Amino acid sequence: MRILLSNDDGIHAPGIQTLAKYLREFADVQVVAPDRNRSGASNSLTLESSLRTFAFENGDIAVQMGTPTDCVFLGVNTLMRPGPDVVVSGINAGPNLGDDVIYSGTVAAAMEGRHLGFPALAVSLNGHQHYDTAAAVTCSILRALSREPLRTGRILNINVPDLPLDEIKGIRVTRCGSRHPADQVIPQQDPRGNTLYWIGPPGDKCDAGPDTDFAAVDEGYVSVTPLHVDLTAYNAQDVVSGWLERAGVNTQW
């Protein structure tokens, strides 16, 4: 198995380093990751400037100022030859649950892999301690994919409780929960009197029902949520069509 591994925490983050070590026990791994933390970069792609890469002695490649999407795009299209069988993103320091997937660079890297035609996993740890647990879970799922390919065309968003491996209760297939909108903005002033703003923490959970990713992780289970790239709201197409007609939108411009 050939694995392209990326993240959004940066190439030196403990999550990606731990996962690379575990994956290299049974797979060919090419790490292509940002040279610094790019958390919250979502699906952004660098189009207005060039991208510089740096290779380490072990073959890992850092992309200067690159986004997670940049890294996977470069990895698939030029940096990993032969190309990958699967794209893996993580291990993220902290969860990507519910609405987090909208902003997550970890999920975005996996989404880019899927967009380019590859099976893709996004892996996050609900904390900052038990990276070995998340790595072991990821390896188990990848071995399962090797034995029995999953042909859903979906991204698997995997969230792992921050627990020792022997305390993990199992795996649940879940849906994304949701949070209340985040609305906290923290103002500060720099020494010159200019106003600075920090975006505050995410909102509290508002939908954490028993079938959600929030509930699974809180109860000690690994959450596996299938995600898809197609954002079309098919069930709303007829509703929007009817609304346009009733509202009398004139297409004779």
From Swiss-Prot:
It is found in: Cytoplasm. GO terms for molecular function: 3'-nucleotidase activity; 5'-nucleotidase activity; exopolyphosphatase activity; metal ion binding; nucleotide binding. It catalyses: a ribonucleoside 5'-phosphate + H2O = a ribonucleoside + phosphate; a ribonucleoside 3'-phosphate + H2O = a ribonucleoside + phosphate; [phosphate](n) + H2O = [phosphate](n-1) + phosphate + H(+). Keywords: Cytoplasm, Hydrolase, Metal-binding, Nucleotide-binding. A divalent metal cation binds at residues 8-9, 39, 92. Its cofactor is a divalent metal cation. Its EC number is 3.1.3.5, 3.1.3.6, 3.6.1.11. Binds 1 divalent metal cation per subunit. The keyword Hydrolase applies. The keyword Hydrolase applies. InterPro entries: SurE (IPR030048), SurE-like_Pase/nucleotidase (IPR002828), SurE-like_sf (IPR036523). GO terms for cellular component: cytoplasm. NCBIfam families: PRK00346.1-1 (NF001488), PRK00346.1-3 (NF001489), PRK00346.1-4 (NF001490), surE (TIGR00087). Belongs to the SurE nucleotidase family. Nucleotidase with a broad substrate specificity as it can dephosphorylate various ribo- and deoxyribonucleoside 5'-monophosphates and ribonucleoside 3'-monophosphates with highest affinity to 3'-AMP. Also hydrolyzes polyphosphate (exopolyphosphatase activity) with the preference for short-chain-length substrates (P20-25). Might be involved in the regulation of dNTP and NTP pools, and in the turnover of 3'-mononucleotides produced by numerous intracellular RNases (T1, T2, and F) during the degradation of various RNAs. This is 5'/3'-nucleotidase SurE. It comes from Enterobacter sp. (strain 638).
